[in-house]
Amino acid sequence: MEGWQRAFVLHSRPWSETSLMLDVFTEESGRVRLVAKGARSKRSTLKGALQPFTPLLLRFGGRGEVKTLRSAEAVSLALPLSGITLYSGLYINELLSRVLEYETRFSELFFDYLHCIQSLAGATGTPEPALRRFELALLGHLGYGVNFTYCAGSGEPVDDTMTYRYREEKGFIASVVIDNKTFTGRQLKALNAREFPDADTLRAAKRFTRMALKPYLGGKPLKSRELFRQFMPKRTVKTHYE
């Protein structure tokens, strides 16, 4: 793939004394691993551009799993993330690195990612609605199809006041037992609309996406979540990540 592509750096690490190993998310090729030769040298013009949350145009090539970066241009300055929104951005970057296979095209997801980063950059309140929408979009692109609006058992539309439990490969069925794996019809409608007007629907969305993403993430904890707990105030951590 030698043409220019829109891209974002998800993660980078040193690779030899003068080069970087990049994990990037591109519009056409999906997630790609690149070597940026000379990017760490003092004279490199790429060093400042190859950072997370900077919209890029990249050109790369090669036949192996690890491609070689040919050229890179920053489309604009990095989107301004700091504090909670920075850790939120690191979280979705790590999420993509953990669940996406290399060189699988996800063009629509690329724009979902861009929209999420833009929403985080412009957030004046909690970043959680943007995170939940992105997680739901990611699940959809991974093939995790869920019907939030109908009871799988009866075929009837979900009722706001009833409780439902999710069964894999079946959907939501009515439940008389209420626990952390059940959802009200009102919460399911909010998930379907991807609109979370209050704390109740936001908490429900977080419960569902964590449950749904768990098989993709396995038992390995997310580093971004641990960093958030380590560096942000305890009250903030509990509000946004517990």
Curated annotation (Swiss-Prot):
Coiled coil: none
GO cellular component, one term: bacterial nucleoid
Listed transmembrane segments: none
UniProt key word 4Fe-4S: no
Assembly: Monomer.
Its biological purpose: Involved in DNA repair and RecF pathway recombination.
Name listed for the protein in its UniProt record: DNA repair protein RecO
Organism annotation: Shigella boydii serotype 18 (strain CDC 3083-94 / BS512)
Taxonomic placement: Bacteria, Pseudomonadati, Pseudomonadota, Gammaproteobacteria, Enterobacterales
Record gene name: recO
